[in-house]
Amino acid sequence: MRLIPLKTAQQVSKWAAKHIVDRINTFAPTAERPFVLGLPTGGTPLQTYKELIKLYQAEEVSFKYVVTFNMDEYVGLPKEHPESYHSFMYNNFFNHIDIQPQNINILDGNTDDHDEECRRYEEKIKSYGKINLFMGGVGVDGHIAFNEPASSLASRTRIKTLTEDTLIANSRFFDNDVTKVPKYALTIGVATLLDAEEVMLLVTGHNKALALQAGVEGNVNHFWTISALQLHRHAIFVCDEPATQELKVKTVKYFTELEQRAIHSVLD
């Protein structure tokens, strides 16, 4: 496990974007051998997408041979709805880079057969071998994608009922009206995430501090989905200072010294 303790959320976004670009460029993708990138939605990764767009515009990276898989999508929300994850991804990222439309994969929450859609999604991921890098965020309760507390750590892509806490948290995108938030979503599973070659979680803000503590210092258990990343060979937590408030001082000190070069790469 790696923990990259930075000062601000802006530094987290810059570090994450640079890491993604470095991974893509080192991989040197082609049409026959694309780089497979897993992506989240939500407020935390928004600035990272802006940084990636800047790097693309500066001609430091191309997404022409990048294949993407998104983590989740609401059930029953039309794709053209401004708060659908289809709309989010196109408005905030895909419309601004050179990714090929056929390389974009987002779960269809409006299909008549949700189980078949989830099975198809898993098979599509497998057809590429693996996801090379999966970027994600984390909820205040430690959930990743829509794998809420008590989700099976062996779970695969499936339909999930959203918790009351998640409905309340997401109501800020729906005029602060909980009744407008879809009650169900299609989501990748915890095991789907763990199958990725590398997982990078962005953790920012004091309200995520308990989740980060559970992920780094806590025991692996299904009430804290984030803790499953302790089982992953290449997991990276990129966090700002407020998110480290619940970690032991010696934990932060250890990773600050260990990742000194990585930290300074975004500060220089």
UniProtKB/Swiss-Prot annotation:
Record: active site: D72 (proton acceptor), D141 (for ring-opening step), H143 (proton acceptor), E148 (for ring-opening step)
Gene that encodes it: nagB
Pfam family, one: Glucosamine_iso
GO CC field: cytoplasm
Domain of life: Bacteria
Quaternary assembly: Homohexamer.
The name this protein goes by in its record: Glucosamine-6-phosphate deaminase
Keyword Hydrolase: yes
EC class: hydrolase
Pathway info: Amino-sugar metabolism; N-acetylneuraminate degradation; D-fructose 6-phosphate from N-acetylneuraminate: step 5/5
GO molecular function: glucosamine-6-phosphate deaminase activity; identical protein binding
Cysteine pairings via disulfide bonds: none
EC number: 3.5.99.6
Record keywords, A-Z: Allosteric enzyme, Carbohydrate metabolism, Hydrolase
Function statement: Catalyzes the reversible isomerization-deamination of glucosamine 6-phosphate (GlcN6P) to form fructose 6-phosphate (Fru6P) and ammonium ion.
Similarity comment text for this entry: Belongs to the glucosamine/galactosamine-6-phosphate isomerase family. NagB subfamily.
Example GO biological process: glucosamine catabolic process
Activity regulation (record text): Allosterically activated by N-acetylglucosamine 6-phosphate (GlcNAc6P).
